[in-house]
């Protein structure tokens, strides 16, 4: 069966590099599944869960922004930030969520700051979702 080489990198490090069967990524226009021999594509990513499947195993990562490049045999993710499920600091994510919710409760937050706060809240919520999923299903 054909495979895809998946490389997920940030400015600081390589987060994931494996041969996979399928990649499910959070594109800016919605979630997309990428299989081997996919047509070439370049798209921006939004904060969300990126899933990589190898056989019956599924790996979950959190990506926040960046770009995804698809070639027939390779997927490269250049993320603003990325972390594997097992790397998520749950206490830190809970605190980030609380801070973002408190900021959003302020009715006088300027437009640009409101957008940044909303993005922070989304990142925290995705991190908590992925961490909780891993806690319930340790193989993820």
Swiss-Prot record:
Query: One GO molecular function term?
Result: proton-transporting ATP synthase activity, rotational mechanism
The residue range of the signal peptide is none
Which CDD domains does this entry report, sorted A to Z?
F1-ATPase_delta
Q: Known InterPro entries for this protein?
A: ATP_F1_dsu/esu_C_sf (IPR036794), ATP_synth_F1_dsu/esu (IPR001469), ATP_synth_F1_dsu/esu_N (IPR020546), ATP_synth_F1_esu_C (IPR020547), ATPsynth_dsu/esu_N (IPR036771)
Q: Which residues form a coiled coil?
A: none
Q: Which family does it belong to?
A: Belongs to the ATPase epsilon chain family.
Record note on quaternary structure: F-type ATPases have 2 components, CF(1) - the catalytic core - and CF(0) - the membrane proton channel. CF(1) has five subunits: alpha(3), beta(3), gamma(1), delta(1), epsilon(1). CF(0) has three main subunits: a, b and c.
What PANTHER family has UniProt attached to this entry? ATP SYNTHASE DELTA/EPSILON CHAIN, ATP SYNTHASE EPSILON CHAIN, CHLOROPLASTIC
Q: What is this protein called?
A: ATP synthase epsilon chain
Which species is listed as the source? Dehalococcoides mccartyi (strain ATCC BAA-2100 / JCM 16839 / KCTC 5957 / BAV1)
Task: Supply the source organism's classification.
Answer: Bacteria, Bacillati, Chloroflexota, Dehalococcoidia, Dehalococcoidales
